[in-house]
């Protein structure tokens, strides 16, 4: 515990000691087969050295390594890998309550990276993190995704990398406000993947300065960014898509839409650098 200097044998003991307080838990280098449930307070989970605190294979409540339902949570420098649970939604992080910031972290070879849904004005920020080998449509009744988040607040994803998807979408959001900027989506080694970004129920904000490289082994190749495919809960008016780069694999043989809109709100599509064969817009 950074504030007190007290050490704990396992992570959950440290978390439970905080109760409704505020604390930073410093996690020493190592491979941990542990998980924890945060039920209150404001907790920062921080690796002493980024990338050296590795949580491998253990999920609490059949959900995730970190099940977060406190006042707020920060996850900094942690690696989550090999998370699988019977319902197909095994995640590094399950956010159920409270604002969440994730930075400098890695989510590897699991059913899901970050999963959460709550009917509040929650703010989620994900930055400088890696999502690889995630997603499945084989283990779950519904597909699992690298990131799958729903709230009535906002989601920001920036300076992060998505690669080697194993099913589902790379980013699936059901939120009114979003910012997805300066990320890399590399599907070249993906398999059974779908959209890069699925804004299932609409939403507005900014998608800018991302690089998208489509791969040859997609389950659904028809769009990179798809808006309101499942409903029009949130307005997409003014959603700005600008300054992105998108490419196709050699001899792809398909012509996907860069942005496909199932809703009726006007999306603001600016200048994007699209490889031959990619259609800028499709109204569905």
Residue ranges, per PLM feature:
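Extracellular beta-strand/beta-solenoid scaffold signature
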Residues: 57-66, 86-94, 109-118, 138-150, ...
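Leucine-rich solenoid repeat scaffolds
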Residues: 253-284
């Amino acid at each position: 515990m950074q504030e007190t200097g007290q050490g704990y044998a396992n992570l959950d003991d440290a978390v439970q000691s905080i109760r409704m307080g505020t604390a930073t838990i410093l996690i020493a280098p190592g491979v941990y087969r542990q998980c924890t449930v945060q039920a209150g307070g404001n907790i920062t989970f921080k690796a002493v050295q980024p990338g050296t605190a590795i949580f491998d294979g253990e999920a609490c409540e059949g959900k995730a390594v970190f099940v977060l339902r406190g006042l707020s949570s920060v996850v900094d420098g942690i690696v989550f890998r090999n998370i699988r649970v019977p319902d197909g939604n095994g995640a590094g992080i399950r956010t159920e309550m409270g604002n969440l910031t994730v930075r400098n972290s890695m989510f590897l070879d699991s059913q899901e990276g970050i999963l959460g849904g709550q009917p509040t004005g929650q703010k989620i920020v994900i930055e400088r993190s890696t999502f690889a080998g995630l997603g499945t449509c084989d283990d779950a009744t519904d597909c699992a995704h690298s990131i799958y988040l729903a709230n009535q607040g906002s989601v920001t994803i920036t300076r992060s990398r998505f690669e080697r998807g194993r099913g589902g979408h790379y980013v699936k959001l059901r939120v009114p406000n979003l910012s997805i900027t300066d990320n890399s989506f590399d599907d070249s080694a993906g398999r059974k993947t779908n959209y890069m970004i699925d804004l299932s129920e609409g939403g507005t904000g900014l998608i800018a300065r991302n690089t998208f490289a489509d791969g040859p082994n997609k389950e659904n190749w028809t769009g990179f960014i798809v808006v309101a495919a499942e409903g029009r809960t949130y307005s997409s008016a003014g959603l700005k898509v600008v300054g992105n780069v998108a490419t196709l694999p050699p001899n792809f043989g398909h012509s996907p839409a860069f942005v496909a809109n199932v809703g009726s709100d006007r999306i603001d599509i600016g200048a994007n650098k699209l490889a031959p064969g990619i259609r800028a817009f499709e109204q569905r």
